[in-house]
Amino acid sequence: MQTEKTVEMKKENMILWVLVLLFAVIMSVPFLVPHTGMLALFGLIPLLSMERIATMLEKKRVWIYHYSAFVIWNAITTFWVCNATVGGGLFAIFANSLQMSAVFGLFRWSKRKFKGALPYIFLAVTWIAWERFYFDAEISWPWLVLGNSFARTLWAVQWYEITGALGGSLWVWACNLGIFGLMTSLSDGSWWNFNIKAKAAAVTGCMAILIVPFIVSALIGRKYKDAMAAPESLETLIIQPNIDPYNKFQALTQQQQNAIFLDMAAKELEERRNDTTAAPILILAPETFTSDIIVGQYDRSLTWRRFTSFLKEYPDVNLLFGASSYDYIQSPLRPSHTARKMGNGLWLESHNSALMTDWSGRTEIFHKSKLVVAVEHTPYPAVFCRIDDLLGGVMGRCTGQDEISLLNVKDTEGQNIPIGCAVCYESVYGEYYTDYIRKGARAMTIITNDAWWGDTPGYRQHLSYASLRAIETRRAIARCANTGISAIISPTGEIVSETQWWTPAVLEGRIPLRDDMTFFVVHGDITGRICTFLSILLLLALIVRFRSF
């Protein structure tokens, strides 16, 4: 008898683990394979089924199953972080999974007091509330926001111009819960207790949730089919120097890197030499191209001097490049938690910056403000910077800006074309990214260095998220990546032209200049705010119910 029970338990456990693996695989595919975003619309069903079966079987320690499910999903989709930092990659996988599992655990806890569909509604809105919180948290890693599943299925989500990516998260939850609800009612027999009208309403509602967003997307997308043919445009020259960041200073000096970059630019600009009548052109260099910039003292930089000297022959050319930049501060006291002591009352603040310059030496600078945890940013600096000092300063201490600022392309008559420049990781943050447009950006640029991850899905995912930003803001993007993939992206998110990975390349094209603002730009992340509000209300109701008994 005991043997039969043991065999039965093994079968039950096997079913649960199969559902765990099925969830992880289905939800990973949209992040890895183009045009598979629709899988996310039912990818959560195995996880929900696992939880329901485990509850019916009165399994103990169900958290092991759902935590394992999230770990496997995170590992399959973001393993590539380990190429840059093994410790950071493992921390991202396990810590991110822990937060997901905590949200799911809260849902299981709510089932003790909430009945019917309410616990599942609580799960959906709390998950989206957590995603919204994650965008602004000190330790932030919103890579696997459910709405990002459609980053390479763009035809289905042109309505992101209204909702942003969290609208996609809501769609994922609505479809999964709708289908799961129908499956549950069929499996427990309650479906047969519904009258014809109730059955029709359930099926119709489920179909509407699934199909209507596709129709809306098609209707909205038609408005922008000629978006690249705007009355005004900016010519861009994207230069991908293809310099291995792991050997950046061992293999080549900065002067040699400058020479490589300028040689590539000169070949494309030959016809513009000393032409004062040509339309302005913007040249892009990648993130952290140089590391010799002192803020406010640009003429001390060999790279800056070399660039401005080169540009004197091209009065219509503006150059945007990335740099590690520094502020030196003389103070008897530490000016900030992130400042590093240099000695004799001198302190150093570091930045990951984008600079715009031209033949006149005019220089504008923007500091990246959404920073990679540990690599660039020490979270909760009042606490962890002190610990980091004791460890010898192993964590990044970059500082950003309090608010976004724009960079200006100038023509030969001194007229400005305001553009935004999202530096690398900033392009993952949808609502933050809209600030560039609200400030007046007529087009967008992204500069990045994705080579740290090697030839993995990481740089492809990063590129695809830029397409979502284009849809949300309806601004074309010129994207420059050190080793690829550089691209020109239309306001519909379509990649108009692109370079190859790990290849020196120059990409030339025009990006339209626009002044309109989408609903998402004007109003922000309404989906996230509403879900946060509902989550708090339901959580308070849950606490009250627990305290009442």
Write out the residue ranges for each language-model feature.
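Intrinsically disordered, low-complexity coil segments
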Residues: T55-K59, S187-A201, K225-A230, E270-P280, ...
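Generic structural signal for well-ordered alpha-helices
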Residues: V103, F107, A265-L269, I404, ...
